[in-house]
């Protein structure tokens, strides 16, 4: 599609592909090997729909993996999550098991809702990259 590498899908000036089973950090590093490559970001409803359809098309229905990494991560300090209690005090991770700092799309929501999970799990992931020159 639109000069993307074989097997990749074109959308609004970039190329996208689903890959299998890495932790969030491994997946981001893997995506970095392509020009402008990163885990996919979702900035609009139209893009969310494109990504959901891409995953549904590429991830076998028989696959046991029902979650897919996206490029969203809580970058707050390691011992605190980015959420606050209603009185504005911080939530400390020692009370949250496991730490949930990276986000997936889940088959149960037809790959349309963002869900925070432990970054060390291994899931399939979607890379976004510039069109190869």
From Swiss-Prot:
**Which GO molecular function terms does the record list?**
toxin activity
Q: Residue span of the signal peptide, if any?
A: none
Task: List each copy of the C-type lectin domain by range.
Answer: 11-128
> What pairs make up the disulfide bonds?
4-15, 31-127, 102-119
In which domain of life is the source organism classified? Eukaryota
Q: Name one Pfam family in it.
A: Lectin_C
The terms describing its cellular component in GO are: extracellular region
Q: Which residues cross the membrane?
A: none
| Alphabetically ordered keywords of this record | Disulfide bond, Hemostasis impairing toxin, Platelet aggregation activating toxin, Secreted, Toxin
Where in the cell is the protein located?
Answer: Secreted
Q: In which tissues is it expressed?
A: Expressed by the venom gland.
* Function description: Echicetin itself inhibits aggregation of washed platelets induced by vWF, thrombin or alboaggregin-A. However, when complexed with the pentameric plasma immunoglobulin Mkappa (IgMkappa), echicetin binds specifically to GPIb and activates platelets. This is caused by P-selectin expression and activation of alpha-IIb/beta-3 as well as tyrosine phosphorylation of several signal transduction molecules, including p53/56(LYN), p64, p72(SYK), p70 to p90, and p120. In vivo, it induces thrombocytopenia when injected into mice, probably accounting of activation of platelets rather than inhibition.
Query: Which family does this protein fall into?
Result: Belongs to the snaclec family.
| Quaternary organization | Heterodimer of subunits alpha and beta; disulfide-linked. Forms an active complex with the pentameric immunoglobuline Mkappa (IgMkappa).
Tell me the protein's name: Snaclec echicetin subunit alpha
Q: Which organism is it from?
A: Echis carinatus sochureki (Saw-scaled viper)
Q: Organism classification, top ranks? A: Eukaryota, Metazoa, Chordata, Craniata, Vertebrata
């Amino acid at each position: 599609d639109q000069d993307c590498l074989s097997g990749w899908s074109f959308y609004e000036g970039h190329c996208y592909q689903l890959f299998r089973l890495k932790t969030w950090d491994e997946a981001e590093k893997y995506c970095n090997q392509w020009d402008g490559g990163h885990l996919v970001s979702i900035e609009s409803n139209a893009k969310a729909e494109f990504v959901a359809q891409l995953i549904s098309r590429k991830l076998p229905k028989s696959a046991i993996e029902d979650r897919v990494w996206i490029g969203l991560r809580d970058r707050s300090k390691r011992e605190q999550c980015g959420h606050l209690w209603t009185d504005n005090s911080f939530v400390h991770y020692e009370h949250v098991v496991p730490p949930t700092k990276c986000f997936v799309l889940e088959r149960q929501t037809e790959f349309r809702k963002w869900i925070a999970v432990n970054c060390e799990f291994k899931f399939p992931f979607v890379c976004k990259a510039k069109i190869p020159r």
